[in-house]
Amino acid sequence: MPRSPAKTSPRKGSPRKGSPSRKASPKRGGKGAKRAGKGGRRRRVVKRRRRRRESYGIYIYKVLKQVHPDTGISSRAMSVMNSFVNDVFERIAGEASRLTSANRRSTVSSREIQTAVRLLLPGELAKHAVSEGTKAVTKYTTSR
């Protein structure tokens, strides 16, 4: 004989089977219970700051606008360019580091960077990169 649904479901306000009672317990005071400790101060909620993603995007965009002012770039193409710049940077930095340790020095100088660029980039591209780099270093030292 089936039971009626009213008898099987718990009554409103009664605790469920296996869960603690909702009545005032020593841990949790009732409505008028005052908490011990500092007089009613609220705990400040600390928001987690979003981690900043570093990229060469703004610089790639500036160069694009210098070369082709009327051309845009998609986010996928920007991602590819960013990966390319990171790759070239890592290659040059790694080679410059090896050159520095081979010369038994502890500081990477512009000379090691220049040699690394000459070793990594082919022919005419290396010459242009070295001349542009020298120009940039000269501009930086004169502005200081």
Curated annotation (Swiss-Prot):
A motif (SPKK motif 3) lies at residues 14-17. A motif (SPKK motif 2) lies at residues 9-12. Residues 1-51 are annotated as: Disordered. The modification Phosphoserine is found at residues 14, 19, 25. GO terms for cellular component: nucleosome; nucleus. Contains 5 SPKK motifs which may interact with the minor groove of A/T-rich DNA sites. Phosphorylation of this motif may regulate DNA binding. This motif is reiterated in both termini of histone H1 and in the C-terminus of plant H2A, but its presence in the N-terminus seems to be unique to sea urchin histones H2B. This is Histone H2B.2, sperm. It comes from Parechinus angulosus.
